[in-house]
């Protein structure tokens, strides 16, 4: 599958992604994606039935940057902290071709949300289904599909999952 060095890079990609989201360092979020990278948030029921409807579908790094602008400048909401708990990634496949190495991996996640004046609750849980490619800057997401378990989300999704 993958050698230890590559797997260690994969672990760092997942943990660094979670830390950027948890520290609200939104400007760094797009850096995890290649220019044509996609980010989608989809209910498990739709995914398992092959239905394309997503709660959120960002089709390029430019759209991901626009989302960052929205989070920082235009969206009004009760502020909250979030904490990602991400399982160890499981490598599903590795392909090598003229464009380089492409890893398909998945990892379970839970996002805990804490309102400044309230309790901590599980906001979203599911798994990431990722396609990761090697670039001169290291491993980057070609696509991140967040498949969440519940059909309903208790409130709007503001921050990245």
From Swiss-Prot:
Top-level EC class: oxidoreductase
Complex formation: The salicylate 5-hydroxylase (S5H) multicomponent enzyme system is composed of an electron transfer component and an oxygenase component. The electron transfer component is comprised of a ferredoxin reductase (NagAa) and a ferredoxin (NagAb), and the oxygenase component is formed by a large subunit (NagG) and a small subunit (NagH).
Pfam family, one: SnoaL_4
Family matches, as InterPro entries: NTF2-like_dom_sf, Rng_hydr_dOase-bsu, SnoaL-like
Species name: Ralstonia sp
Recorded GO CC terms: catalytic complex
Keywords: Aromatic hydrocarbons catabolism, Monooxygenase, NAD, Oxidoreductase, Plasmid
Record pathway: Aromatic compound metabolism; naphthalene degradation
GO terms of molecular function: salicylate 5-hydroxylase activity
EC number: 1.14.13.172
Protein name: Salicylate 5-hydroxylase, small oxygenase component
A biological process from GO: salicylic acid catabolic process
Disruption phenotype: Cells lacking this gene are not able to convert salicylate to gentisate.
Signal peptide feature range: none
Reaction catalysed by this enzyme: salicylate + NADH + O2 + H(+) = 2,5-dihydroxybenzoate + NAD(+) + H2O
Function, in words: Oxygenase component of the salicylate 5-hydroxylase (S5H) multicomponent enzyme system which catalyzes the 5-hydroxylation of salicylate to gentisate. Active only on substrates with a ring-substituted carboxylate group with an adjacent hydroxyl group. Primarily active against salicylate and substituted salicylates, but not against 2-hydroxycinnamate, 3-hydroxycinnamate, 2-hydroxyphenylacetate, 3-hydroxyphenylacetate, 2-hydroxybenzophenone, 1-hydroxy-2-naphthoate, 4-methoxysalicylate or 2-hydroxyacetophenone.
UniProt KW Oxidoreductase keyword: yes
Assigned protein family: Belongs to the bacterial ring-hydroxylating dioxygenase beta subunit family.
The keyword RNA-binding is assigned to this record: no
């Amino acid at each position: 599958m993958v050698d230890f060095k590559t797997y260690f890079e994969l672990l760092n990609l997942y943990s660094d992604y979670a830390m950027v989201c948890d520290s609200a360092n939104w400007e760094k979020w797009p850096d995890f994606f290649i220019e044509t990278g996609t980010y989608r948030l989809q209910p498990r029921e739709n995914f398992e039935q092959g239905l394309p409807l997503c709660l959120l579908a960002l089709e390029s790094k430019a759209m991901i940057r626009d989302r960052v602008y929205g989070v920082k400048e235009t969206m009004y909401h009760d502020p909250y902290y979030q904490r990602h708990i991400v399982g160890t990634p499981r490598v599903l496949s590795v392909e090598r071709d003229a464009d380089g190495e492409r890893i398909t991996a998945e990892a379970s996640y839970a996002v805990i949300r804490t309102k400044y004046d309230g309790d901590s609750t599980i906001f979203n849980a599911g798994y990431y289904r990722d396609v990761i490619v090697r670039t001169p800057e290291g491993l980057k997401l070609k696509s991140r599909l967040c498949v969440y378990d519940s059909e309903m989300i208790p409130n709007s999704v503001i921050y990245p999952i």
